[in-house]
Every structure is written in structure tokens, then in C-alpha cells.
């Protein structure tokens, strides 16, 4: 079986007491059939640090972007464009809108979101989107900026079936994290049942949001296995099928050559 953690923050893990190094994290993941990761940046300096931390590997690719919660730290759009064009970068982001924590930066968030989509279209690289308390504006910007030209994923999806449908209409993929396993997430489970298999991704969002039965612990790529097993039950398929489908979806969205994944198997 071959699973992909489609969204993790490898630079945020506890390398002092839980993991020896990135090799250790990836070995723990591989032991649970999680054999490929997308390491997601939230600032430009963070991307550079993570690139140095992880190094060049066959089983890790990167995104480059500025998270909506980091809009108080100015950045140069040309720097974003230059770094996002690097060969190891497969996506723009994590970008999007978060009005829950920082509504005061709403305008800057929207401008940054637009820049990420525009660069994604220029480079033919998809966008990784975060949204919280900003559903209408997120959908509006995705439409207005013609996100269908580059594609993307709504990561760590927490919205309802209706929102999922609107994202699917835009050609988006939808990624589910450990939140889907939480006891009070029935609306999310309803949305997960609705999303077709060929638009589905699974992720950890490590080091956050560890799935049941690991609540309260640091999340890590190995735990995407728990998300996949839970999602397989929701979708009524074997976990092996869900693993294959989500891996194929990941490769298609992020333009990962099948031969690269085959070499890791």
C-alpha cells in the first residue's frame, strides 16, 4: 500500500524530544505505508528553512507561500514568484483567507490570495487553500481569479456539503485531515461521503490536529494512515483502494510523474 500525506509542516515537528531528524519522521511514516509527503510552507523564510531542513529527496516535495495568518509580515511578491518557480516546488501556498483570527488583515489577505493564484496560473502550479470564517470571499476570489487555469485543493476541509459542491464545480480537490475523526464532526463526515473518490486527498496538517486515537499528541505524517482508514470506512471502500485513489489524485493535481512514485514503492 502507498499513502501520501498531502499536507504537512515538517519544519514544525518536535525534533528535540520526539524525532531524531527528518529521516526519523519519514521512516516512521514509511513503516505505516505513508511513503510520500508534501511539505507546506507558511512564510517565505519558512520555506527556505524547510528546504534546508529536509533537503532534496525523492519522497518529499514542497509548496511555497504565505499563510493568511502571516500577513502582518510584509513580503515581496517577486520573491514569492521566484521561489515558487523552483523545481522542487509543486504548489503555491498555503494561501487563502482566515477571518476568524485576524479579521483586521482582511484586505491584505485578499491581495495575497490573489497574488498566489495569479502566480499559480503563470507557473501552472496549483494553489493550496486555507479558509476559516471566509467561505463566500474564498469562493468569490477563486472564481474571479480563474483558479480553474491552475487548479487547487481546499486543505483541511471543515465546511459543509454545499461548499464542497461549489469547490468541485471549480475543479478543486478536497483534502480531509484528522478532524474528520473527531466526535463532533458529523457535518464534515456528511461532506466526506459526498465528495467523489476522484477528488479526494488525505492529509495530517502535522504537527496539528492529530486524529483519533492520537488526540492530544503531536501529529506526524505516519498518522495519515489513521485518516485514510477512517475515510475508507466512510466511503465504503477498502483502505487499499482509498490509498491508491488518493495517491493517483495527488499525482494528477500536483503534476508528479508516476515513475517517481513507482520508484519509491
UniProtKB/Swiss-Prot annotation:
InterPro entries: DNase_TatD-rel_CS, Metal_Hydrolase, TatD-like, TatD/YcfH-like. GO terms for cellular component: cytosol. Signal peptide: none annotated. Its EC number is 3.1.-.-. It comes from the Bacteria. A divalent metal cation 1 binds at residues 7, 9, 94, 205. Its cofactor is Co(2+); Mn(2+); Ni(2+). Pfam families: TatD_DNase (PF01026). GO terms for molecular function: DNA nuclease activity; metal ion binding. Transmembrane segments: none annotated. Binds 2 divalent metal cations per subunit. Has D-tyrosyl-tRNA deacylase activity in vitro. Belongs to the metallo-dependent hydrolases superfamily. TatD-type hydrolase family. This is Uncharacterized metal-dependent hydrolase YcfH. The lineage of its organism: Bacteria, Pseudomonadati, Pseudomonadota, Gammaproteobacteria, Enterobacterales. The gene is ycfH.
